[in-house]
Amino acid sequence: MKKLLSFVLAVAMLLSMASFAAAEEGNWKVAILTGTVSQGEEEFRAAEKAIATWGAEHIITDTYPDNFMSEMETTVSKIVGFAADPDVKAIVVCQAVPGTKAAFDKIKETRKDILLIAGTPQEDPDVISAAADVVMYADEIAQGDTIMETCANWGIDVLIHYSFPRHMAMELIVGRHTLMQQNAEALGIELVDVTAPDPTAEAGLSASQQFILEDVPQQMAKYAGKKVAFFTTNCGMQPSLQTAILDQPNAYYPQPCCPSPYHAFPATLGLELAVGGDDEAALKAIAAKLKDYDAVGRYSTWASPVAMTIIEIGVEYAKGYIDGTIEGRNDGAKLAELLQAKIPGAKVANYTNAEGTTFDNYYTVLLAPVDFNDYL
């Protein structure tokens, strides 16, 4: 009799657990915060794609302000607001602009159950990794090698580096710039720093874009007869930079700041590309259009949109955590497996800073630059 009673109780417990799991399966939500189309279309479209994939009943989205530096309280409020919904079990912020760390800290005071994921963070690694469960970013520093390798292959004489003080205070951007300087010196390339208007300042993005459109021709005149490559650290400046370079035979574009087939290329070249669709088809369409401008050998990027992938994998990882197939908050092996399945050839590593400190929940992703001649 006792054995039978024990068996009945065990079955009841299992049924109760199954019922709870079923409820979790039906009610779970992942919240995603991205930039707007003007500041980060890829992330915005990735959030839309997540809704299409998982359903609006499971994915909720919002955007942070374009002037996020002066409206940080709005960003914090939106992230914290997600946690007010008891069905939200994970939050993905990409780009993780300033305010993300403060919001995550606030959420952890009352909702320790929520998985917190930061993508493309604009707060330094030691800051954001202390607040987030998982951080993902394209490998900024290693791009100091890949960008300069591309420039060397092109026979570049001068590299113009556009940025502004806010970006040049960020650890990873500074690390990339330092490596670019070292490589430029070794390769005999002149690296020239040019300060552009910050698009989050009062004059806004349009002032930054206009500056680029006016400055590129001036730089080409200054370095007449030389091969000049241009790079800017800001997403919103990419369309202007690509456009300004297009009709300059000696101007080169090694990659966008967030390398991808979709980062400004569709707008610059007048292409109707499904952002985040068929990457190879997108690369072929870009190559064909660049050929019309005799510019196939003057542009490069990465073969896959890492920023979009961060959101896609962030949601997939979160779902695994919610349903229990991923047991820990920070499962590096599983995260690398998901990233490499989505982007074959991706190099995934933990970030280690200049002092030798490795952050075990901060993951960087690196791809090789493309040669558009391979897509003709």
What residue ranges belong to the model's regions?
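Flexible loop/hinge segments that line or gate small-molecule binding clefts
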Residues: 106-140
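Hinge/cleft segment of the Venus flytrap/periplasmic-binding protein
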Residues: 282-376
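Periplasmic-binding protein-like
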Residues: 30-34, 86-97, 114-119, 160-162, ...
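Extracytoplasmic "Venus flytrap"
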Residues: 27-77, 92-98, 173
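An alpha-beta-alpha
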Residues: 47, 139-193, 318, 334-340
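Short, well-structured alpha-helical segments in soluble
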Residues: 72-89, 106, 207-226
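Hydrophobic alpha-helical segments within soluble ligand-binding/sensing domains
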Residues: 133-161, 175, 211-214, 281-291, ...
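Extracellular/periplasmic periplasmic-binding protein-like sensory domains
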Residues: 180-192, 239-323
